[in-house]
Amino acid sequence: MAKEATRVRRRERKNISSGVVHINSTFNNTMITITDAQGNAIAWSSAGAQGFKGARKSTPFAAQVAAEDCARKAQEHGMRSLEVEVCGPGAGRESALRALQSVGFVITSIRDVTPIPHNGCRPRKRRRV
């Protein structure tokens, strides 16, 4: 039995003027997702998706490259202004934010939504170098 050819779905151009950027910056990687106001993903990128491997994924430069790529994808959909939600303790937080500003987005607000435990789970052991 012949398998049906999978149809390639073309991305339709959505005219969305404002959105929300979720910057998730961990110690190992930086993930950036741009959504509309309802939370539907418009564009995403990460340092690993841009070809950085291993320890280079966690650098500020990798976060900057990922943010610029994600911003270009969102600008194709007509996005101009952004709210920023930053989550996590990683090195790419500020550099991703600066990259979004340099591309030409108007940033209306910046929120830090890093979850802070009120004495929850026991943390990882401290590194001794």
From Swiss-Prot:
<dbReference type="GO" id="GO:0019843">
    <property type="term" value="F:rRNA binding"/>
</dbReference>
<dbReference type="GO" id="GO:1990904">
    <property type="term" value="C:ribonucleoprotein complex"/>
</dbReference>
<dbReference type="InterPro" id="IPR001971">
    <property type="entry name" value="Ribosomal_uS11"/>
</dbReference>
<dbReference type="GO" id="GO:0006412">
    <property type="term" value="P:translation"/>
</dbReference>
<dbReference type="InterPro" id="IPR018102">
    <property type="entry name" value="Ribosomal_uS11_CS"/>
</dbReference>
<keyword id="KW-0687">Ribonucleoprotein</keyword>
<dbReference type="InterPro" id="IPR019981">
    <property type="entry name" value="Ribosomal_uS11_bac-type"/>
</dbReference>
<comment type="similarity">
    <text>Belongs to the universal ribosomal protein uS11 family.</text>
</comment>
<keyword id="KW-0689">Ribosomal protein</keyword>
<comment type="function">
    <text>Located on the platform of the 30S subunit, it bridges several disparate RNA helices of the 16S rRNA. Forms part of the Shine-Dalgarno cleft in the 70S ribosome.</text>
</comment>
<dbReference type="GO" id="GO:0005840">
    <property type="term" value="C:ribosome"/>
</dbReference>
<keyword id="KW-0694">RNA-binding</keyword>
<keyword id="KW-0699">rRNA-binding</keyword>
<dbReference type="Pfam" id="PF00411">
    <property type="entry name" value="Ribosomal_S11"/>
</dbReference>
<protein>
    <recommendedName>
        <fullName>Small ribosomal subunit protein uS11</fullName>
    </recommendedName>
</protein>
<dbReference type="GO" id="GO:0003735">
    <property type="term" value="F:structural constituent of ribosome"/>
</dbReference>
<comment type="subunit">
    <text>Part of the 30S ribosomal subunit. Interacts with proteins S7 and S18. Binds to IF-3.</text>
</comment>
<dbReference type="InterPro" id="IPR036967">
    <property type="entry name" value="Ribosomal_uS11_sf"/>
</dbReference>
